[in-house]
Regions:
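A generic local secondary-structure boundary/capping motif
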Residues: 25-26, 47-49, 67-69, 119, ...
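Short Gly/Ser/Thr- and Asp/Glu-enriched loop/turn motifs at secondary-structure junctions
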Residues: 30-32, 64, 73, 114-118
Length: 214
């Protein structure tokens, strides 16, 4: 069984070609459910195709690596493009961005946040954010999916168990491994989270960063 893998063309798809000074950040909320698979993934191996087709959920293939993710209107996507002369250590860039996200979420009172795996953020041992990175000759492109309030059953409905997983997952199912901010803490307004993250990045990068008004 197969399903069409569309070229990635979601809200942040133009950020690699936009004109900006050094760094551009866009925090956005998906308008509909979608599955986005990594560059090395195949939908047949990672997507629950019957459920995706039944529900009319489109599958997109991104340029960055990593495993497949579900996007819904109950999540926030954090996208950052950066002009580069030399692409350094990707782990350092993941850590820089993810630590700033942790700083912002901590200001909202969310506790027990930490870096996990290659590029995840977790509350305790449960994942709330996964991120991936792509680069071309001129720019790096980081994007992360933050689960604000989505029910994990939705993720389970559209994704099979990943072909690769971080050590800290230890074979756990999506239901056992993933959580949301609202489940672990309390419900926040999406704009409240968006604003505090934009402020933290603006304070850190100053005039180097441009925040997209989306």
């Amino acid at each position: 069984m197969s399903i069409t893998e569309h070229k990635y063309n979601l809200a942040d798809s133009d950020i690699l070609t936009d004109v900006f000074l050094n760094i551009k950040m866009m925090i956005w909320r998906p308008e509909a459910r979608a599955v986005v698979i990594g560059n090395s993934n195949k939908a047949v191996n990672t997507v629950d195709i019957p459920n995706a087709e039944k529900d009319g959920v489109s599958v997109y293939k991104r340029n960055s690596g990593g495993e497949s993710v579900v996007l819904t209107e109950n999540m926030l996507i954090i996208s950052i493009a950066k002009n580069i002369e030399k692409f350094g250590n990707s782990k350092e860039m993941f850590n820089q961005y993810n630590n700033l996200i942790i700083e912002g979420l901590s200001k909202l009172g969310i506790k027990n946040l930490g870096l996990k795996g290659i590029s995840d953020i977790a509350i305790g041992e449960k994942k709330i954010l996964g991120s991936a990175m792509y680069r071309n000759k001129d720019r790096s492109f980081y994007h992360a999916v933050l689960n604000v309030s989505e029910d994990i059953d939705i993720i389970t409905r559209y994704l099979r168990h990943p072909e690769r997983e971080p050590d800290y997952r230890s074979g756990r199912s999506h239901k056992e491994f993933v959580t949301s901010i609202s489940k672990e803490h309390k419900k926040f307004e999406f704009n409240e989270i968006k604003t505090i993250l934009e402020n933290v990045f603006s304070e850190h990068f100053g005039k180097e960063i441009e925040i997209s008004e989306n």
